[in-house]
């Protein structure tokens, strides 16, 4: 038997490259989570999940590791502080969390609390987000930046909140917004705090590149900025403008694109200062990416730079332009939401079943039987018996032709169902035999390099792709996925992961592998009476809030966990996932009304003797219990 170690498992899932030293495999072959990079303290995920199940918290379970969240906030601020010291930068850095990345109250409150020492702020882009941010701001102390489209109600809310002491900046995205702000400021007599968003010609890279450039949805063109400055001077509001904002898109994969945007933004800052705008801040927006696949490349699921390089370039480029122009350096703001929250959240769920070939009928006897077989089946038997590495390529091509021939003959009525089943069984046996031979070949012939895909099985996991990791479906985003146990054993199956929705799109067929993106996930055969769990990692950004109710699968159970030196971990908060009753309510069904209608039908059934009173009572109890149950599958 081939020896296998936990290091081999770490390698095939590329764990050490995407894990950021926050995830490791222990000697038992189980995934562990660390509160900070290289910490000696850890939580074993498999044991944690077992403990949660004992507490009646069922999978799928979203695990939020609050120490990791705190550590990410500290890490981003630390690297900027170091960059400021290294470059002798004369101003400050400030983090703002864009709450659109994850608006869950417990998450935003935790970020605000962890970030107090760094004077962290919140960025909002809608009226609901504004109200949420105001509610989080204890003693009006939390700075808030308002981006996005704004109507009269939005602007008035900000103005009156400003009057009572809230620190809120309105960022002007369009000229009509500025006109509205001027009008409402004069009407209320309240002077606003203002910023201006510029539409840079520089673009980002990857899926969100269109957030930048001259065709971007938001921001003022250079000519519009000149108009805005004139308007602000005309109405004596020019001194209210303290911030220049730009954004070239989320998950910018190439550092050179970031540098270009920084240079352009800094030049605009310098020129606006020369025009009499007393700017104090540059808000460089988001874009700091996450290395989801661990490749450290410019592929859209990765980045070709570190957080340290990013911070150093931000500080250096802005300082260089300002020093050259003889202009005071601004305080710097970034809105790095993805990089802040991606790592702290892991979803774990159980595998329900597989479509493994082992469930096929056993036709072993046909390999030795002398009785007549159909010519197609007989040829497949001959290939299976004779195949070796010398005839591999020819036998592979012949096998593909024969299985297609079997389907055609069946459709024409020349093969019966049993013959077709025999052909399928032989095909899978031949493919397995070829796979064993291919694994020993060096080099592998070109047409056999993707051969493994024909061996791929489907593992059905207890989750909804559309609810828990919608970006995997919507934009083909890669997320690290791997088993959380048995990592001291060599995987003996390659698989795709299918969810439990009634949708053929609910399947993951792209994974993070040893050499980048791969079309299969190495897994282990399922053992009888033993749960097999997989983890979905780096899903803290956007996934919860973008998830939808496809097939009415609702929010999963969520658990907030902190590390504890005495007991290893502490469960701080448990947020129950949606019950069926809640999911039905979202689409205007009432659980009590449903029960009433069914009760009426049952009474009619009892009266007409279609069902007994005992059966009627049992069914009503069952339906009531079902309506109150978790939307995901149990036993």
UniProtKB/Swiss-Prot annotation:
GO biological process: arginine catabolic process; putrescine biosynthetic process from arginine; spermidine biosynthetic process
Keywords for this protein: Decarboxylase, Lyase, Magnesium, Metal-binding, Polyamine biosynthesis, Pyridoxal phosphate, Spermidine biosynthesis
InterPro entries referenced in this protein's UniProt entry, alphabetically: Ala_racemase/Decarboxylase_C, Arg_decarb_HB, Arg_decarbox_C, Arg_decrbxlase, De-COase2_CS, De-COase2_N, De-COase2_pyr-phos_BS, Orn/DAP/Arg_de-COase
SUPFAM superfamilies hit by this protein: Alanine racemase C-terminal domain-like, PLP-binding barrel
Documented EC number(s): 4.1.1.19
Binding site for substrate: 282-292
Enzyme class: lyase
Coiled-coil ranges per UniProt: none
Recorded GO MF terms: arginine decarboxylase activity; metal ion binding
Catalytic activities: L-arginine + H(+) = agmatine + CO2
Required cofactor names: Mg(2+); pyridoxal 5'-phosphate
CDD domains, per the entry: PLPDE_III_ADC
Functional pathway: Amine and polyamine biosynthesis; agmatine biosynthesis; agmatine from L-arginine: step 1/1
Keyword Magnesium applies: yes
UniProt-listed Pfam families: Arg_decarb_HB, Arg_decarbox_C, Orn_Arg_deC_N
Signal peptide: none
Function in brief: Catalyzes the biosynthesis of agmatine from arginine.
Alphabetical list of NCBIfam families matching this protein: PRK05354.1, speA
Family: Belongs to the Orn/Lys/Arg decarboxylase class-II family. SpeA subfamily.
Matches recorded under PANTHER family: ARGININE DECARBOXYLASE (PTHR43295), BIOSYNTHETIC ARGININE DECARBOXYLASE (PTHR43295:SF9)
Record-given protein name: Biosynthetic arginine decarboxylase
């Amino acid at each position: 038997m081939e020896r296998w170690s936990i290091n081999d498992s770490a390698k095939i899932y590329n764990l050490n490259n995407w894990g950021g030293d926050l995830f490791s495999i222990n000697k038992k072959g189980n995934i562990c989570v660390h509160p900070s990079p290289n910490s000696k303290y850890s939580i074993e995920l498999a044991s944690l999940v077992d403990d949660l199940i004992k507490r009646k918290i069922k999978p799928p379970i979203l695990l939020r590791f609050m120490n990791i969240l705190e550590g990410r906030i500290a890490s981003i601020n630390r690297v900027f502080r170091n960059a400021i010291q290294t470059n002798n930068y004369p101003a400050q850095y400030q983090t703002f969390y864009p709450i659109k990345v994850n608006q869950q109250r417990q998450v935003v409150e935790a970020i605000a609390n962890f970030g107090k020492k760094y004077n962290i702020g919140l960025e909002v882009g809608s009226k609901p987000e504004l109200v949420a941010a105001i509610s989080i701001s204890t003693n009006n102390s939390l700075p808030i930046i308002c981006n996005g489209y704004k109507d009269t109600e939005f602007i008035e809310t900000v103005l009156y909140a400003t009057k009572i002491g809230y620190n809120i900046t309105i960022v002007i995205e369009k000229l009509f917004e500025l006109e509205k702000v001027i009008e409402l400021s004069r009407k209320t007599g309240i002077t606003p705090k203002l910023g201006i968003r510029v539409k840079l010609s520089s673009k980002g890279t990857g899926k969100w590149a269109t957030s930048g450039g001259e065709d971007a949805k938001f921001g003022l063109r250079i000519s519009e900025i000149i108009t805005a400055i004139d308007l602000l001077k005309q109405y004596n509001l020019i001194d209210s403008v303290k911030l220049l904002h730009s954004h070239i898109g989320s998950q910018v994969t190439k550092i050179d694109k970031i540098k270009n945007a920084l240079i352009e933004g800094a030049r605009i800052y310098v020129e606006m200062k020369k025009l009499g705008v007393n700017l104090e801040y540059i808000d460089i927006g988001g874009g700091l990416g996450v290395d989801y696949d661990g490749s450290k490349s410019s592929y859209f699921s990765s980045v070709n730079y570190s957080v340290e390089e990013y911070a150093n370039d931000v500080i250096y480029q802005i300082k260089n332009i300002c020093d050259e122009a003889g202009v005071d350096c601004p305080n710097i703001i970034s809105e790095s939401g993805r990089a802040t929250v991606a790592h702290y959240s892991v979803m774990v769920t159980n595998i329900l079943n597989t479509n493994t070939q082992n469930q096929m009928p056993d036709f072993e006897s046909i390999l030795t039987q002398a009785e007549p077989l159909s010519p197609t089946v007989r040829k497949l038997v001959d290939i299976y018996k004779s195949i070796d590495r010398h005839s591999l390529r020819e036998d592979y091509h012949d096998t593909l032709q024969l299985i297609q021939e079997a389907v055609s003959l069946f459709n024409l009525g020349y093969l019966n169902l049993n013959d077709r089943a025999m052909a399928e069984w032989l095909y899978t046996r031949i493919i397995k035999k070829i796979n064993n031979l291919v694994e020993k070949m060096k080099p592998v012939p070109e047409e056999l390099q993707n051969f493994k895909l024909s061996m791929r099985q489907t593992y059905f996991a207890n989750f909804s792709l559309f609810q828990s990791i919608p970006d995997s479906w919507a934009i083909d985003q890669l997320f690290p996925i791997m088993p959380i146990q048995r990592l001291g054993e060599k995987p003996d199956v390659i698989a795709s992961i299918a969810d439990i929705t009634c949708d053929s799109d609910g399947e993951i067929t792209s994974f993070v592998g040893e050499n980048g993106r791969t079309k299969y996930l190495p897994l282990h055969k399922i053992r009888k009476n033993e749960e097999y769990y997989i983890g979905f990692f780096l899903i803290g950004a956007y996934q919860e809030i973008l998830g939808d109710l496809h097939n009415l699968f609702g929010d999963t159970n969520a658990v907030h966990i902190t590390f504890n030196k005495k007991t290893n971990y502490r469960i701080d908060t448990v947020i129950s996932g949606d019950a069926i009753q809640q999911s039905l309510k979202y689409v205007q069904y009432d659980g009590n009304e449903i029960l009433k209608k069914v009760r009426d039908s049952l009474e009619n059934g009892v009266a007409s003797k279609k069902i007994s009173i005992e059966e009627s009572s049992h069914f009503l109890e069952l339906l009531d219990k079902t309506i109150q149950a978790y939307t995901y599958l149990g036993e």
